[in-house]
Amino acid sequence: MNEYLKSQSIAITGANSYVGLNFIKFCLDKKIKVKAFCRNPGSFSDDLKKNSYFEGFPYTLSSKSELKLKNVDSIIHLANQRVNSSRIGFNIDPNLEGAKHLIAQCKIHDIKNIIFLSSHLAYKETLSQYGKSKFACEKFFIDNGHTVVRSGIVFGGEALGFYKNLLFALKSNKFFPIICANAPIYPIHIEDLMNIMLMLSKFTHNTKKLYCLGEKHSIKLNFFLSRLAYKFYNKKIIFISLPGKIIYILTNALGYF
């Protein structure tokens, strides 16, 4: 790792997430200073709190308070809030509002580079509310001169959050209900994702603002899950396909109320 990265300071939002905690430890191992922002910085382990390269700060997407970004070179923006309200009463996307506030704070502290972690579910015709929110944030960050990383399903590293729950479900069940079993996905190992985000974090001017990461050729969702079950638990999973279109129609209709 070159001398620039050793002296680099990175801020991470959503820092107590699966990707966030793995990324923090990844940076600290390389002697990169980390300012970690999350809802509850008290939840960080004692080992992290004692590390001289680490600082934790409270943060929510809805907060408009000043962020402790002094001497930060770049920001890895992982924070995301699921929209739980009905679509009838949905007026403001907290993720987009958080993006606006973060960019405003960057201008105050003269930070040139935000790397926003998005998803392959983010595209114009997406049916997912999660994907729609990510897509709107993508456009806002790119329009303001920052970088978007559109990632496939992330796996590997220390199992936390959704990935941990997924592995537990595979371990605990022989029969596994699944929607869109044959859906094409482009998984990426978390170490590869972290290496690329770290590389992008040292750039102040990028010629390309959107990076799509994952396997070059798609694999089916049920194949990916079956390989995880075999790798970690040496077991075969029997998948029970659920009617994806019917479930989508029902949940989409119920989501208005």
Question: What residue spans do the PLM features occupy?
Answer:
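NAD(P)H-binding glycine-rich loop region in Rossmannoid oxidoreductase-like domains
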Residues: F57-E97, Q105, H120-K124
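N-terminal Rossmann-fold cofactor-binding loop
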Residues: F37-G42, L61
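N-terminal Rossmann NAD(P)H-binding glycine-rich loop of SDR-like oxidoreductase domains
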Residues: S9-K30
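Mid/C-terminal beta-alpha module of Rossmann-like enzyme folds, strongest
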Residues: L200-F257
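SDR active-site strand-loop-helix element
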Residues: T13, F37, I75-A79, I114-H120, ...
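Conserved Rossmann-fold NAD(P)-dependent oxidoreductase catalytic core, especially the SDR/UDP-sugar
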Residues: P94-S133, T147
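Substrate-positioning beta->alpha
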Residues: L160-K164, I179-S201, K208-C212
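Conserved beta-loop-beta element that borders a ligand/cofactor-binding pocket
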Residues: K139-G157
